[in-house]
Amino acid sequence: MIRKAFVMQVNADAHEEYQRRHNPIWPELEAVLKSHGAHHYAIYLDQERNLLFATVEIESEERWNAVASTDVCQRWWKHMRDVMPANPDNSPVNAELKEVFYLQ
């Protein structure tokens, strides 16, 4: 498994809405993530700084990257763009984090 972590932002007035939209996520999005090898996906909110920290274990970079081209992912990004900064393609603005410690 490959462990990934990344940071995103959520609009200051959208914390509750962001959480509501993720509880639960669309069943078809969950199915796509799982079928593309994503496991143990978690998102954490830093309310003071409006930051979202995400962690996920993936089976391969290629399968993970392929999620972005699925119809359901494209629809999800469009659905979320009003509660968080988004790129021109509607994907959330994010930055990958470098793992500096891991205790198994």
Curated annotation (Swiss-Prot):
Domain of life: Bacteria
UniProt xrefs under SUPFAM superfamilies: Dimeric alpha+beta barrel (SSF54909)
Swiss-Prot/TrEMBL catalytic activity: alpha-L-rhamnose = beta-L-rhamnose
GO terms (BP aspect): rhamnose catabolic process
Molecular function via GO: L-rhamnose mutarotase activity
Major localisation: cytoplasm
Protein keywords: Carbohydrate metabolism, Cytoplasm, Isomerase, Rhamnose metabolism
Family: Belongs to the rhamnose mutarotase family.
PANTHER family per UniProt: L-RHAMNOSE MUTAROTASE
Purpose of the protein: Involved in the anomeric conversion of L-rhamnose.
Name listed for the protein in its UniProt record: L-rhamnose mutarotase
Species whose genome carries this gene: Salmonella heidelberg (strain SL476)
